[in-house]
Design a protein with these regions (language model features):
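Short glycine-aspartate micro-motif
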Residues: 4-8, 58-60, 96, 130-134, ...
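ATP-dependent carbohydrate kinase catalytic cores
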Residues: 94-125, 217-238, 243
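Short beta-strand-loop/turn "lid" adjacent to the catalytic site in phosphate-handling enzymes
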Residues: 50-97, 102-115, 132, 265-270
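Short amphipathic alpha-helical segments
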Residues: 18-19, 43, 72-74, 109-110, ...
Length: 318
């Protein structure tokens, strides 16, 4: 039987792995800037594993951008491909392109207990949708549906671009400063790596501090070292994420639970777990009891997008 190859293509890095027996192996990370197209990167990957062209029968790539038609242009790097040309060049039978956040959502179906940390307790209802939300370069939001008989459907959306919710005078003050800086304040403009400096500048402006930190990583490092202003930034970030996640649950009836993915939260996981996220998540007035029984997990698995690409391949081609 031919092997299957999966890839998770980002703006800077492309991750590749082989998918066999419901498992990943031989994960490699390559810089997209080093290659003119994905075929070149995959050829090097296969060569490093001493695999010839034609050894792989099916490929699934998790990509950013619309995936219809033969021609595909990556929105986060310089790569582009033709489906037919890709298959001919690499001697593969099948190429499946899947939205990157759909792959992330499908990856939730293979998580093990050690791949998550509990944020809010509860028992998921497997007959209801689950929310997948991911602060990273942007804010990804998707829905995961259990279709039964080991079949899953991931529905990507644009939930990261909803308006940022406010629930107290302090948040209104910060929102006003951010609005004066950037105009429309979407959830993504705050709940992303670039959002942390915006919240930091807003707190400094409102409270009369001189800003000295200029990046999300600097703010996170300062918070881990005990800086009180940086800690405020992470607290507001966590509470806003709770409100947005709770709103998504109410919108879709997401009693299947909430999975938090992406690269931002794991940098300050312990601070996040002690934050006001859970309180803000369930702070929905007459619907608070509805939210209190819904579990929330922080996903710590290193390659959920690759796993999701494997699940998509398995469902598409068996």
């Amino acid at each position: 039987m031919k092997l299957a190859l999966v890839g998770d293509i980002g703006g800077t890095n492309a991750r590749f792995a082989l998918w066999e027996n419901d498992q990943l192996h031989s994960v490699r990370v390559l810089a997209t800037a080093d290659f003119a197209c994905p075929q070149e990167a995959i050829k090097l990957y296969l060569s490093d594993l001493d695999l010839a062209l034609g050894a792989v029968g099916s490929v699934c790539l998790s990509v950013a951008g619309p995936v219809s038609g033969d021609e595909f242009r990556f929105t986060n790097n310089h790569w582009r491909l033709s489906r037919s040309g890709f298959c001919k060049d690499l001697q593969v039978d099948n190429l499946l392109l899947i939205n990157d956040f759909s792959a992330m959502a499908l990856g939730m179906t293979r998580l093990q207990p050690e791949d998550v940390r509990q944020v809010c307790p509860g028992i998921p209802d497997p007959t209801r949708p689950a929310v997948v939300i991911g602060p990273g370069t942007g804010l990804g939001v998707g829905t995961l549906l259990n279709l039964g008989e080991a079949q899953w459907m991931a529905l990507p959306g644009e939930g990261g671009h909803v308006d940022l919710p406010m629930s107290n005078p302090r948040e209104v003050q910060l929102w006003q400063h951010i609005y004066n800086e950037i105009g429309h304040v979407s959830a993504e403009s705050i709940l992303s790596g670039s959002g942390l400096p915006r919240v930091y500048r807003a707190i400094c402006a409102v409270d009369g501090h001189t800003p000295v930190l200029d990046s999300d990583r600097a703010i996170t490092a300062a918070a881990l070292a005990g800086d009180p202003v940086a800690l405020q930034v992470l607290e507001h970030f966590s509470c806003w994420l709770g409100r947005v996640a709770g709103n998504n649950v109410l919108t879709i009836g997401g009693r299947g639970g909430v999975y938090i993915v992406g690269g931002v939260i794991p940098r300050f996981a312990d601070i996040f777990l002690a934050s006001g996220f859970a309180r803000s998540f369930a702070d929905k007035g007459c619907m608070s009891d509805y939210l209190k029984g819904i579990p929330v997990w922080l996903v710590t698995a290193p390659y959920p997008g690759l796993i999701g690409a494997g699940v998509a391949l398995q469902q598409a081609f068996g």
